[in-house]
Amino acid sequence: MLPELKDSADISISGRPEWRDVEAQLNAAVFRGLLAYLRRYPHTLIAPLMLEVPGKDGARHRLTPERLRAMDDAELSPIVQTVLRPGAINLQRYTGGRGGYPYWHCELYPRDAHGETLHRHLLWTIYLNDGFGEGETEFLYQQRKIAPRAGSLLIAPAAFTHTHRGNRPQGGDKFIATSWILFQRAERLYAGG
């Protein structure tokens, strides 16, 4: 990566035994946040796929925003896990006064032969610290800047509609954990025919 586009120190923790507990804690926190996000924006889950769920009468019913919002976590979680999956988690450090990701970008693009980057549906960031100036996540079309607050979770669509950048922190380093929420691969989603 060119430093004028992105200047950070990154480590991927996914699949590394020494980071397994941290990865599990981050994924659990993000999943809790995702359930709340889906209740607020139910079409995130139901617009891409016409989902059906069994009703109390045993018949299958289309999953509507109202049905989704009424589900408790125990009902909603298996549906979400059937459709979506976590991405590889990166820890990133942006050095104060120098680091950042000033290039306007989105998270959905063709890159690898398996099309993993094209399966990205949502992005997420957990801010691991604060106490520095600027360093916001800025969304171009929404004309919005999200100020980092330690422990807060940001979830947003991965597509160009949420083109964003990471502004340079001032007066201190910025640390984040970040990844994506991806669709399951079609082979898995449609394995039953």
State each model region's role.
Residues 1-153, 161-193:
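Fe(II)/2-oxoglutarate oxygenase catalytic core
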